[in-house]
Swiss-Prot record:
Biased composition (Basic residues): 349-358
Single GO MF descriptor: mRNA binding
Note, other: Present with 33400 molecules/cell in log phase SD medium.
Any GO BP: meiotic cell cycle
InterPro entries (UniProt xref): Bfr1
Organism: Saccharomyces cerevisiae (strain ATCC 204508 / S288c)
Region (Disordered): 346-368, 447-470
Cellular component, GO annotation: cytoplasm; endoplasmic reticulum; nuclear outer membrane-endoplasmic reticulum membrane network; ribonucleoprotein complex
The protein, known as: Nuclear segregation protein BFR1
Disulfide bonds: none
Length: 470
């Protein structure tokens, strides 16, 4: 941790506190000045009697304003009603004109009946000509129709008269709602308030001056508080950045350590697979084929071991085999080895054992005779018996069996040679798949490590933010 703090400079608390102390001294001075101004404001007060009188006048003004608003509303409603009645009267007069016609000479039934009586008297006198009489009869018919129409429109006329009367009533009410008196009351009341204000103006001016000074001090104090908050915020941000760098460095170091361990383990596992791949590239069945060839050298005097140029620098003469000793199979006797010399267990097929035997067989192109004489008879060496058993080939106990064994060995030799290339390819592909899988597994493990560390970082960040909120 000390090395990290040396690498990342820690914010200096003393520098922050020094700045804050300077601002706190200024704040204390401003608070003292504000307290003095408050006392002065309390000393410059208008007396209670004047305050009460002014309050009464202000309340009276509020009532007058409310009355004026009510008067305005009522007058507006009356004007609206008069407009509606005028519209109704106009509509009703239009209805009357439509029924009577604009050229009607009589507007009442009495006038029409009087004219009918005059016409009847004229006709009854007999002084009229036939044409005059017909005209008067026609006029009388028109008058009778007019009388009917006048009777029908009489309710409309009465309604018009009622509307006119209502309009006159509303106009009288409107004249009664004169706002001038209320306005005069308001002006008188306001004048009294102005007089009180003039008397107390000096006090108010002094108080206003004090209010302005106090507001200026409030503003200056707010600026100091803002500077204090900014200093604290800057320090918190610097410290937060410092902690973030430490956490980032710690997580980075943890990631490097975990990835380093992962890489070391990968190198170990990859080394094993590379060694396995090296063995896989050795032609398949090398041990079995070599064992078969060495067995054939012993069992078949005519057999010539194929030349194999394992090391390109070696001459072909160095790899030539010596003639095998002829097997006399007439009186072969199977000899059971002693426990001290030979254990009757199939030899291990491990790579280590195969490699050891392969090297041994390669170095000894011409094996020593594995036949010994026991009581004047030839016997098989225990190593040959074990090899034939391992190859799953018949162990010869007479001359006929030797031929069978040779045939089986040659057949198995051909089978193994025919499958050698394909099997070698399969062995290599199998190991290469393991290597590919190993690379993929360690790549996934590496991604998992990075993911876990990222989740850890986010979790620590969330916990830090929660602690800060609390």
């Amino acid at each position: 941790m000390s090395s990290q703090q040396h690498k990342f400079k820690r914010p200096d608390v003393s520098v922050r506190d020094k700045k804050l102390d300077t601002l706190n001294v200024q704040l204390k001075k401003i608070d003292t000045e504000i307290g003095l101004i408050r006392k002065q404001i309390d000393q410059h007060q208008v007396n209670d009697t004047t305050q009460q009188e002014r309050k009464k006048l202000q309340d009276k003004n509020k009532e007058i304003i409310k009355i004026q608003a009510d008067l305005k509303t009522r007058r507006s409603n009356i004007h609206d009603s008069i407009k509606q009645l005028d519209a109704q009267i106009k509509r009703k007069n239009n209805q009357i004109e439509e029924k009577l016609g604009k050229k009607a000479k009589f507007s009442s039934t009495a006038e029409a009946k009087q004219r009918i009586n005059e016409i009847e008297e004229s006709i009854a006198s007999g002084d009229l000509s036939l044409v005059q009489e017909k005209l008067l009869v026609k006029e009388m018919q028109s008058l009778n129709k007019l009388i009917k129409d006048l009777v029908n429109i009489e309710p409309i006329r009465k309604s018009v008269d009622a509307d006119k009367a209502k309009i006159n009533q509303l106009k009288e009410e409107l004249n009664g709602l004169n706002p001038k008196d209320v306005s005069n009351q308001f002006e008188e009341n306001q004048q009294k308030l102005n007089d009180i204000h003039s008397k107390t103006q000096g006090v108010y001016d002094k108080r206003q001056t004090l209010f302005n000074k106090r507001a200026a001090l409030y503003k200056k104090r707010d600026e100091l508080y803002s500077q204090i908050r900014q200093i604290r915020a800057d320090f918190d941000n610097e410290f937060k950045s410092f902690r973030a760098k430490l956490d980032k460095e710690r997580l980075k170091r943890e990631e490097e350590q975990r990835l380093s361990k992962l890489l070391e383990q990968k190198d170990v596992d990859m080394g094993k697979l590379q060694e396995k791949l090296t063995h896989a590239k050795i032609p398949a069945f090398t041990y079995e084929i070599g064992a078969i060839e060495n067995s054939l050298l012993v069992l078949d005097p005519t057999y010539v071991k194929p030349k194999k140029n394992i090391l390109p620098d070696l001459s072909s003469n160095a790899l030539e085999t010596k003639p095998a000793r002829k097997v006399v199979a007439d009186d072969l006797v199977l000899v059971t080895p002693k426990k001290d010399d030979f254990v009757n267990v199939a030899p291990s097929k491990s790579k280590k054992y195969k490699k050891k035997n392969q090297q041994k067989n390669t170095e000894n192109e011409q094996p020593a005779s594995i036949f010994n004489k026991v009581d004047g008879k030839f016997t098989l060496e225990p190593t040959l018996i074990a090899t034939l058993a391992e190859l799953d080939v018949t162990v010869p106990i007479n001359s006929d069996d030797v031929k069978i064994t040779v045939e089986q060995l040659k057949k198995k030799h051909e089978e193994l040679l025919s499958k050698q290339e394909e099997q070698t390819k399969q062995n290599i592909e199998s190991v290469e798949k393991e290597i590919e899988k190993l690379n993929l597994d360690y790549s996934n493990k590496e991604q998992q490590v990075k993911k876990e560390l990222e989740e850890k970082r986010l979790k620590e960040q969330e916990e830090s933010e929660k602690d800060k909120e609390n």
